[in-house]
């Protein structure tokens, strides 16, 4: 999150990207994710989760650092696409690696505890990058990229991988045939399970909504709402302070959430997920319509907190439905691909609304698009949050 904050301010304040260009950044990224999400998930399932994670962090770090070194909107959009390709190597691979190492039954609490540790790292990184941005916003963007690149080096050097085992050499086919077989098995696994289909469709609408908020939030605050008059506090200081407050609240909220979902039923996990998504919808709608900075700031904090809790809960529920470890990363990537389709398809339309009718209209449309996702998650609860008994997946 710290690098996202300084990058989002950098492209609005220093590079002066238009609403359409801001959304096109996300569209390019999500188009890349759509094309590469499943293939890279298949690589993680076929070859190595660790290798996939290392490639992803190295690529994301390099792309972020390069954004701080260019000034052309076209170059920034292209680098965002490169970031998206790199991200797909981490999407699904991390959760699949963790499930293999500790078991699915321990995955939920581990993801939440990991999120809690992540809040600490986010706060430390936020303080460092915001402090650096007071000297040079461009330097803080480059530094954030280099830190992400360093994570890739650490993963390659020190991350264990004992739970994942490749097929014996005698059972392997040609590389492309082996990848195609894994992809086909993952797709069949999703199609055969009603609940997984509902989760994937929900991600489609969630992606459309998040694209509007993620790309237009800071522009709305800077151009429509306006920052309080405080000569000593720049935009990065305000956004950094908001991020820090959300991080502190998130740290304590995750502790409460761990106690709520640990050793609880799948239905309880599903209930928490639906509630968090409803909170995100309400807060995004308030943010889109208000003009007071204080109310907008509270809405930003609520969205940030709810979404940070939503991610590990969603992954817990999704992984509870995946009973075949050999396609785990692929199935997670299919869900991620649905999110990417939503962002790539909805982004240009919402950006055009912003250009024609203003940022408030675009953000309102983005919030309303989230309603079908809430409805689909609610429908999934009719299955008690668990997949009904089905016939075994055909070979």
Q: What is each PLM-predicted segment?
A:
Residues 1-34, 194-244:
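Helix-loop boundary and gating motifs at the non-cytosolic
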Residues 32-35, 238-262:
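Transmembrane alpha-helices of Major Facilitator/SLC transporters
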Residues 33-71:
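Conserved MFS/SLC helix-loop-helix module at the cytosolic interface between two early adjacent transmembrane helices
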Residues 53, 270-273:
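Primarily marks hydrophobic transmembrane alpha-helices of the MFS/SLC 12-helix fold
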Residues 58-71, 277-291:
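C-terminal ends and interior cores of transmembrane alpha-helices
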Residues 80-119:
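Cytoplasmic helix-loop-helix junction between adjacent transmembrane helices
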Residues 144, 149-172, 379-390:
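Helix-loop junctions on the cytosolic side of multi-pass membrane transporters
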Residues 160-199:
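Juxtamembrane intracellular "pre-TM" segments in multi-pass secondary transporters
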């Amino acid at each position: 999150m710290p690098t996202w904050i300084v990058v989002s301010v950098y492209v609005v304040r220093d590079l002066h990207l238009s609403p359409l260009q801001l959304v096109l950044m996300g569209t390019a990224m999500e188009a890349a994710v759509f094309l590469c999400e499943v293939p890279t998930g298949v690589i993680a399932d076929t070859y190595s989760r660790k290798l996939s994670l290392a490639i992803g962090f190295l690529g994301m770090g390099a792309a972020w650092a390069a954004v701080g070194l260019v000034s052309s909107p076209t170059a920034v959009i292209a680098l965002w696409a490169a970031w998206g390709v790199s991200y797909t190597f981490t999407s699904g691979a991390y959760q699949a690696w963790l499930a293999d190492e500790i078991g699915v039954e321990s995955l939920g609490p581990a993801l939440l505890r990991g999120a809690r540790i992540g809040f600490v790292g986010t706060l430390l990184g936020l303080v460092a990058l915001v402090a650096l941005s007071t000297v040079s916003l461009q330097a803080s963007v480059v530094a954030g990229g280099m830190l992400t690149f360093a994570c890739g080096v650490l993963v390659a050097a020190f991350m264990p991988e004992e739970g994942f085992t490749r097929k014996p050499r005698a059972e392997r086919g040609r590389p492309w045939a082996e990848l195609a077989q894994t992809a086909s098995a993952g797709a069949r696994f999703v199609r055969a399970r009603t609940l997984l289909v509902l989760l994937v469709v929900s991600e489609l609408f969630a992606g459309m909504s998040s694209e509007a908020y993620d790309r237009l939030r800071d522009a709305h605050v800077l151009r429509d709402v306006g920052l309080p008059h405080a000569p000593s506090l720049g935009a990065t200081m305000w956004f950094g302070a908001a991020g820090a407050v959300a991080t502190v609240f998130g740290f304590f909220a995750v502790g409460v959430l761990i106690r709520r979902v640990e050793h609880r039923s799948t239905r309880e996990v599903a209930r928490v997920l639906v509630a968090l998504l409803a909170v995100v919808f309400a807060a995004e709608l308030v943010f889109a319509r208000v003009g007071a900075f204080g109310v907008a700031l509270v809405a930003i904090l609520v969205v940030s907190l709810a979404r940070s809790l939503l991610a590990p809960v969603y992954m817990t529920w999704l992984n509870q439905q995946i009973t075949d470890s050999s396609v785990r990363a692929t199935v997670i990537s299919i869900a991620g691909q649905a999110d990417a389709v939503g962002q790539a398809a909805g982004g240009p339309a919402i950006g055009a609304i912003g250009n024609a009718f203003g940022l408030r209209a675009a953000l309102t449309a983005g919030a309303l698009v989230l309603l079908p996702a809430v409805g689909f998650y609610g429908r999934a609860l009719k299955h008690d949050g668990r997949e009904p008994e089905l016939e075994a997946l055909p070979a």
